[in-house]
Amino acid sequence: MEHQGQHGHVTSRVDEYGNPVGTGAGHGQMGTAGMGTHGTTGGMGTHGTTGGMGTHGTTGTGGGQFQPMREEHKTGGVLQRSGSSSSSSSEDDGMGGRRKKGIKEKIKEKLPGGNKGEQQHAMGGTGGAYGQQGHGTGMTTGTTGAHGTTTTDTGEKKGIMDKIKEKLPGQH
């Protein structure tokens, strides 16, 4: 939008792209600059003026987008830990050294109910570890397991949730 020949406005000239070209004089400008452009094709400018805020004869000053300062988290070089606990990826091998734990051991360690290592050995062929179906010899009907529950071999497969519920203490 050009304001040519109007009283109180500077005659604005535009280049081949429609951008205002400064005249160098700057008479009659109020010096108002702000966000939001009207009639300009880019930058932070004002309506039909070529400068603003004391910049005489310069056009197109300022960036294309306003980006507010980003507030960053700074901890002053101190690492902050979350509240979650983690288990070690290795354990004592009984010979004075360390051995790497498998996924099964890590999962067992996370489950409530204490150490299940002794109970798995006591169950023998009647059941397996967590997530494994018990494969017996077929002669284990009516035997008592480590928890005092009696298992009967009905040939019916248990669901995963039933197996987990069976392993949890206090659910019998």
Curated annotation (Swiss-Prot):
<comment type="similarity">
    <text>Belongs to the plant dehydrin family.</text>
</comment>
<feature type="repeat" description="Type B">
    <location>
        <begin position="156"/>
        <end position="172"/>
    </location>
</feature>
<dbReference type="InterPro" id="IPR000167">
    <property type="entry name" value="Dehydrin"/>
</dbReference>
<feature type="compositionally biased region" description="Gly residues">
    <location>
        <begin position="21"/>
        <end position="65"/>
    </location>
</feature>
<feature type="repeat" description="Type A">
    <location>
        <begin position="3"/>
        <end position="28"/>
    </location>
</feature>
<keyword id="KW-0677">Repeat</keyword>
<dbReference type="GO" id="GO:0009737">
    <property type="term" value="P:response to abscisic acid"/>
</dbReference>
<feature type="repeat" description="Type B">
    <location>
        <begin position="98"/>
        <end position="115"/>
    </location>
</feature>
<dbReference type="GO" id="GO:0005829">
    <property type="term" value="C:cytosol"/>
</dbReference>
<protein>
    <recommendedName>
        <fullName>Water stress-inducible protein Rab21</fullName>
    </recommendedName>
</protein>
<feature type="compositionally biased region" description="Gly residues">
    <location>
        <begin position="124"/>
        <end position="139"/>
    </location>
</feature>
<dbReference type="GO" id="GO:0009631">
    <property type="term" value="P:cold acclimation"/>
</dbReference>
<feature type="repeat" description="Type A">
    <location>
        <begin position="125"/>
        <end position="149"/>
    </location>
</feature>
<keyword id="KW-0346">Stress response</keyword>
<dbReference type="GO" id="GO:0009414">
    <property type="term" value="P:response to water deprivation"/>
</dbReference>
<feature type="compositionally biased region" description="Basic and acidic residues">
    <location>
        <begin position="154"/>
        <end position="172"/>
    </location>
</feature>
<feature type="compositionally biased region" description="Low complexity">
    <location>
        <begin position="140"/>
        <end position="153"/>
    </location>
</feature>
<dbReference type="InterPro" id="IPR030513">
    <property type="entry name" value="Dehydrin_CS"/>
</dbReference>
<dbReference type="Pfam" id="PF00257">
    <property type="entry name" value="Dehydrin"/>
</dbReference>
<keyword id="KW-0963">Cytoplasm</keyword>
<feature type="region of interest" description="Disordered">
    <location>
        <begin position="1"/>
        <end position="172"/>
    </location>
</feature>
